[in-house]
Amino acid sequence: MNSAGKSMLVCALLSGVLGGFAEETQWKQFPIWGGGYVQNVEISKSSPNVWYTYVDVCGPYRSDDAGNSWRPLHQVYSINERYRGMNPRSLSIDPRNPDSIVYVAGNSWDLKGNIYVSRDGGKSVRAVVKDLHFYGNGYRRWTGILLDRNPFNPDELITAPDSDGIFRGTENGEKWENAGLKDHFFTDIRYDLAVPGRIYACAPAVAPERSADRKPRQTGFYRSDDNGKTWKRLQETAPEEIKQARAKGNPLLGIFDMTELRISEDAGATWKPYSEGLPEAGKEYITNGRFQAIGAGSDFFLAVDTAGTVYRRNIGDPEWKRVIIRRRINREYETGGQLRTAQWFGRAAASINIDPRDEKHWIMTDWFAIWETFDAGKKWQTAIRNICQLISFTVAADPFDGNNLIYGVADVVFFTSRNGGKSFEHDPSHYSGILGGVCSIAFSRISKGVAFICGGKQGSTTILRSKDGMKTWARPALKGLPKLEYGKCAVYTLAANPKKEEIFACVSGPVEPGKGGVYKSTDMGDTWVWFSTGLPADMSYASGEWDNNAANPQIAVGPDGSAVTFNRKTKQLYYLADREKGIWKASDLRYTSWTLPVIAADPFVPGHYLAGCAANEYAESFDGGKTFRRLTTVPETIESISFDEHNPGWVALGCTGKLRVSRDGGKTFEVIEDAMSLPGGHSMRTILDRKRLFLITGASGVYTKELK
């Protein structure tokens, strides 16, 4: 080889990109539809088969067949937008063109949101105004809309972010100007359907502990009669959400404090009680009589409480009447969708809309799905196919049979598959005793059919075990472990020894016997011993499912019995110096960046560990974690490291914006170029098993690809 050829080869090695794999299958999504909080559905007036929807943690989505199937649009976001969490809060379709949309999106006070436009049906988007406070996944995201379009002039829009003031939009959302009313937390803003130039804005009181930056907000119910140029405060107390009927007088229906419905027949100047016939609200969040969703037809109103009870009141009726539901059809489950959303029908309902073309056609969104009825509420069916909005924590494959998978998620615990992810089972009886999310899964490498999961929230934090190949689950005796409590002593990481019947657990809380630290079991989880001598008192192991990176392993165990863990607060790594007595010592590796370390043990090379953190902080150890050598082949922040336990040398790095795969133990990497074409977050967190990639998205399920 001449010198030029050698130089090209060296450059390729240094870049870590050697070219694609010889054969790759296409990415496939786990076929589980539903499972996240759907906020609203918008239907095109010019093309009624075109629908848009959005979820609190992802979206938007588009349907071209009236909700029978959907496709995601949020894969077009940049790395920065994904990192900031551009979750839609409200969306408006141009009534003249179904491909022309405007929407507002964002996530938190610190990571500000944007106003977006798309003129090609969501294939591409542009941020026309940046750095506004929209909370698509924030407080009161279920109330009202924060973007509306003038029914008399579709080129004019209005929006109301938190604290930034109201903004008036012109030229179909291309230009915006501030119209005042800063320092308010708005929950709803709408044009009057009958009076040109009239707009209503709702800014109810905000619980200080729930407001984004804990600062106080002004309150009030406002009306503008000059298209948003000036505003009049009609009263200090504001409804959370309003809807307007087209009956005589165009009355407004409002939700107050989630427990009372009132009506205004004078354009919001005064409000009268309108809750006759409704039950008194319980104290729980999910209860009869607590409302978040109302709808308006031409001459009637609808209301759905958080327990999923639907009520109707015709204009002129003396009271509300319960809509008798005769059947709920989970269409996706009956055709392979795997999630029984019917059992949660209407839970925390966020919206209910009446189709103006057919007022017997209602569309409701709730915690898990989209529902529609064509007979005014007697029979309902889901419309959620191809929307997988599950927040995914982890995936694990059975070491004895790669077709057996366990998929840990937020809120609805976990799913199991026996055909490699082609279909899944989700039976609540399987996980009796655990609620919330499963953050960690460990299969025994010695005993076939034995698996462990951990996670949960509030009073259900625990460890469950299956000894019959995922058929049934039960809590082991757990002798020797402290009382497991969410936010105190909790377990969110389990790890199995690849060569022995040993399982390790990281327990949060102060590191001392009977409290926090690393525990080890040699009898499949029935008894545990404290295994944490030498670890500092404050290891800061995850104490809740939403702790930063709680789903990433906090301990890694090698085939020689070595182990590495890390302090979540100081970023210091520790190695197991005495494998019999459980004595730990500090490694020579301590990260200084704000991100948490990730660690993994090579299942084939004893003592070989990989560790990563922020950009250019990739390192490896060959002595069980005692010393690490820093490498410079990975310029991105590393979000996950996963060795393939069935193929020596294969390892996947999930990085910020890149997915890298190595076939030489992590020395060089190839980039899976199409990973960023998938919807999801900025992280490419990935599990590698049997040359299969399981890409765990932030809130769009899991995608798989086979490498050959």
Residue ranges and their predicted role:
Residues 14, 20-708:
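Extracellular glycan-interacting surfaces
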Residues 1-9:
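Bacterial N-terminal signal peptides that target proteins for export
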